[in-house]
Design a protein with these regions (language model features):
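Short helix-capping segments at alpha-helix termini
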Residues: 12-17, 43-46
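Conserved functional hotspot residues or short segments at active or partner-binding sites
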Residues: 39
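A short, hydrophobic coiled-coil helix within the histidine kinase transmitter core
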Residues: 6-10
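EAL-family c-di-GMP phosphodiesterase catalytic domain
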Residues: 1, 19-34, 46-158
Length: 158
């Protein structure tokens, strides 16, 4: 069964449902642009949004970006790494962040491993980040434990 039909059949009816963001790799978009556009339109009708993953590592063009209703542009980690000290990587990151914002989308930096890179990306206006510096990959049980710990730490004492 196609993903759009699965979501339509099983999604909550609540107006408070936050939806889902599906990541599509840039290479996949380029190879099957027509198909991805059709699926993106079906998903959008069910509260599902698209994030373009690994942006900059593939062969996308402005016409590719123009034709997709994406909400996140995820910068490939190869550009994020050492963007605080590498002028070329910094220029690419800044350009991608600006591009995301011009499309009214969020810029997400992948592979943040140093505090210097995090600071540089923050100054550039990057909206979100992910990587080992922020939180390493972890099993579901550890993630749920981390959420519980953060939730209990944020509650005021009675």
């Amino acid at each position: 069964m196609p993903l759009a039909q699965v979501i339509e059949r099983h999604r909550p009816e609540s107006e408070r449902w936050p939806g889902i963001i599906v990541e599509v790799c840039e290479d996949q978009i380029v190879r099957e642009l027509g198909r991805v556009r059709g699926i993106a339109q079906q998903l959008h009708g069910n509260g599902i949004q698209i994030a373009i993953d690994d942006f900059g590592a593939g062969y996308s063009s402005f016409s590719t970006l123009r034709g997709l209703p994406f909400v996140e542009l995820k910068l490939d980690s190869s550009f994020v790494k050492e963007c605080a000290v590498d002028a070329t990587n910094a220029a690419i990151c800044q350009t991608a962040i600006d591009l995301a914002h011009r499309f009214n989308s969020a810029a997400v930096a992948k592979g943040i491993e140093s505090a210097a890179d995090l600071q540089a990306l923050t100054v550039m206006g990057c909206d979100f980040g992910q990587g080992d510096l922020i939180a390493p990959a972890m099993p579901q049980e550890r993630f749920l434990e981390l959420l519980r710990h953060r939730a209990s730490a944020s509650k005021p004492a009675a």
